[in-house]
Structures are given as C-alpha cells and as structure tokens.
C-alpha cells in the first residue's frame, strides 16, 4: 500500500520482468478497480507490469471516498507511484476512463512517459457524459428506462434530462441510507454492463458470496462515476487542446466500432490530435476489452508499442 496523502492509501502490485521497461495499467470507471487479466496483454518477459487501484476503489482505502478524489489527485498519485517504483520513465496503458487519466498524466509529466496504449477511449467532455447518461437512450431505450425507474424508485422523481439524473442520483449516493444507495448502484452498474459488448454479457454470479462482492464493487463504481461526472469533469478543460505536449510520443489506440458507451468518434478525435498515434478500429466489437478480437488487437498494439519505444530509445541513445 502506498500512502498518497489526504487519508488515502493506494494498493499496487507488480508482474513480469522487474528489469524490463515499465508499463503502468490505469483501470476504468472511475472506480472500476484493477483487472489482473489486463496484465496478460503484455509479455511478462519484456515488460515490468504495474497495476494499482485508484483512490477509493478496489483494495485502496477508504472505499468509495469522494474526498480529495479528482483527476488532479489521481495524477499526483501516479507520480508518487513512479517515485516509489524508482523509475524515471514509463509507458501507460489506459482503459476507458483510464485513457483520460493516462493523457492527463502525460500532459502534466511528459518527461516521464515513454509511450501510451489506450483502449476504449473516454475523453470526459460534457458531450461524452451527455451521451453516456442520456444520448445512448436512442440505442438502448429499455436499458435507459430501467435506470430512470431506479432513480424514481429511490427518490420519488423521474429525471427528464441529464442534469436532473445527476442531481437526483447525487441525493441518493450522498444519503445515509445504505439500502437506497445499493439499490440505485446495482442498476447503475447493470446499465453500463448491458451496453459493454456487441455479444450478450455473462450473467451475474449466482453464488451469494460472489454476488455480494459484485454488488460491493457496483456501489463503489456508481458513487465514483457519479462524483466525477457531476462534480469533477465539468470543471476540467478539454484535454484534446493540450495533447500537443505528448504528441511526439508513440501512442497505440484500439477502439471498438460498436462501442456505445464511448463512441468511436472519441478515438478518432484523439488520434487526429496526436501526430504519433496509430488508430485501430476493431470492426465488430464494442467497449469490452476482453472480447476475443479486441483482446488480440490490444496484444498486437502492446508489441508494436514496445518496438516503437525501443526504436525511440535507440535513436536517442537512451534506455527504453
């Protein structure tokens, strides 16, 4: 555990070759926590793979805390982790929300980055939040209705727009009523889960202990996603305007054509703003990175990124 200040402690772990170039994995959400399977995208003989739970989620403590939990705080945590690891430069692999965090860190600390692998891009602009919370109703009306019904059931009022949705959900998540919070969090998580992939998603576990673990994660995810969408991201600038600070670094982007959570336009806009970005749109997949074709493209991108990092190091006469 790494003490990052503000009462937060961050859980981290390492895999692979400690003497190889480092890649740090940035999970989605915010609040999603690490998926150990993500380490499989990187050859353990050729990468020092580091993953960690961002503030308030996974094994990091305190759980689901929104206190001192902003993008700026998370960027500072990643810099503290780099210092803890004793490394000068590192690659970043971001998934969904983790792509925005990776770009934000790179903009703040370009001198400590070797390259980026980004999948299922989330830019975090107002238009992106609007789409996820309201616009997607055009494709998944019944799924969106279930979320609105859950808000109505827990607040007595059914939202009619994105601002109302966030305001009413905020009343529930900031309340001291655990049952209400869990009820809405379950539906919030289900809402996202049902749109994750082109193919049907696996059902929820039936074992009571496993289901309890899943629902605990649902609560953390819902609270932190809501916190960032309602309070943090609207106050931040458009990162696309600052990508030039890292535009000289290699970047591999993998995105599903039918990603309805984060439409492919976000990946295209990022690639257009990044001179050294290579964009691959997987033609038959959505947001889920573990879909077979998406996973294979990410594997390929990790190998390509390593070659590009090595080539840059050779050209500059430095270690990768």
Regions found by a protein language model. Give the residues of each.
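Catalytic active-site module of serine/aspartate enzymes centered on a nucleophile-bearing elbow/loop
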Residues: 277-320
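Conserved acidic catalytic loop of the alpha/beta-hydrolase fold
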Residues: 72-90
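Conserved alpha/beta-hydrolase "acid-adjacent" motif
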Residues: 260-266
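Active-site nucleophile elbow and catalytic-triad environment of alpha/beta-hydrolase enzymes
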Residues: 226-243
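Conserved hydrolase catalytic core segment
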Residues: 88-130
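Conserved HGGG/HGGXW glycine-rich cap/lid loop of the alpha/beta-hydrolase fold
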Residues: 5-62
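A catalytic-pocket lid/entrance helix-loop region that shapes and gates access to the active site
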Residues: 113-166
């Amino acid at each position: 555990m790494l003490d990052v200040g503000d009462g937060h402690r961050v859980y981290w772990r390492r895999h692979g070759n400690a003497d190889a170039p480092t890649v740090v994995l940035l999970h989605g959400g915010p609040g999603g926590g690490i998926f150990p399977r993500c380490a499989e995208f990187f050859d353990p003989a050729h990468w020092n793979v580091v993953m960690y739970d961002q503030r308030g989620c996974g094994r990091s403590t305190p759980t689901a805390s929104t206190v001192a939990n902003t993008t700026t705080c998370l960027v500072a945590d990643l810099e503290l982790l780099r210092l803890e690891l004793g490394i000068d430069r590192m690659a970043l692999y971001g998934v969904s929300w983790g792509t925005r965090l990776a770009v934000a860190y790179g903009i703040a600390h370009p001198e400590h980055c070797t390259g980026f692998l980004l999948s299922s891009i989330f830019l975090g602009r107002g238009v992106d939040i609007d789409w996820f919370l309201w616009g997607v109703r055009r494709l998944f009306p019944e799924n969106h209705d279930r979320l609105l019904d859950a808000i109505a059931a827990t607040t007595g009022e059914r939202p009619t727009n994105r601002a109302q949705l966030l305001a009413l959900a905020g009343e529930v998540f900031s309340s001291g009523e655990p049952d209400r919070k869990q009820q809405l969090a379950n539906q919030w998580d289900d809402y996202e889960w049902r749109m994750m992939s082109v193919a049907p998603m696996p059902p929820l576990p039936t074992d009571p202990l496993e289901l309890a673990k899943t629902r605990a994660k649902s609560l953390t995810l819902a609270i932190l996603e809501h916190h960032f969408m309602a309070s943090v991201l609207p106050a931040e600038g458009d990162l696309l305007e600052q990508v030039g600070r890292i535009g000289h670094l290699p970047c591999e982007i993998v995105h599903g054509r039918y990603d309805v959570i984060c439409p492919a336009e976000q990946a295209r806009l990022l690639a257009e703003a990044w001179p050294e970005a290579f964009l691959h749109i997987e033609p038959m997949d959505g947001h889920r990175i573990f879909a077979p074709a998406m996973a294979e493209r990410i594997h390929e991108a990790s190998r390509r990124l390593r070659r590009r990092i090595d080539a840059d190091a050779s050209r500059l006469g430095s270690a990768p």
